[in-house]
Amino acid sequence: MPQLNPNPWLFIMFMSWTVFLFLMQPKLTSFISTNSPSNKNKTTLTPTPWTWPWT
């Protein structure tokens, strides 16, 4: 049985990353909405005193 050549692993790795970055990632990130902090209301939580069960 012939042995496979492990030489082009670097080329395959770079090509797979470029395919992911330039083809797949823009399509995947178009479905995800960004959570911008400017749209959030500033709510400050006031701490409530803890009621201990033995008091």
UniProtKB/Swiss-Prot annotation:
It is found in: Mitochondrion membrane. The keyword Repeat does not apply. GO terms for biological process: proton motive force-driven ATP synthesis. Component of the ATP synthase complex composed at least of ATP5F1A/subunit alpha, ATP5F1B/subunit beta, ATP5MC1/subunit c (homooctomer), MT-ATP6/subunit a, MT-ATP8/subunit 8, ATP5ME/subunit e, ATP5MF/subunit f, ATP5MG/subunit g, ATP5MK/subunit k, ATP5MJ/subunit j, ATP5F1C/subunit gamma, ATP5F1D/subunit delta, ATP5F1E/subunit epsilon, ATP5PF/subunit F6, ATP5PB/subunit b, ATP5PD/subunit d, ATP5PO/subunit OSCP. It holds the Pfam family ATP-synt_8. Subunit 8, of the mitochondrial membrane ATP synthase complex (F(1)F(0) ATP synthase or Complex V) that produces ATP from ADP in the presence of a proton gradient across the membrane which is generated by electron transport complexes of the respiratory chain. ATP synthase complex consist of a soluble F(1) head domain - the catalytic core - and a membrane F(1) domain - the membrane proton channel. These two domains are linked by a central stalk rotating inside the F(1) region and a stationary peripheral stalk. The gene is MT-ATP8. Keywords: ATP synthesis, CF(0), Hydrogen ion transport, Ion transport, Membrane, Mitochondrion, Transmembrane, Transmembrane helix, Transport. The chain crosses the membrane at residues 10-32. It comes from the Eukaryota. This is ATP synthase F(0) complex subunit 8.
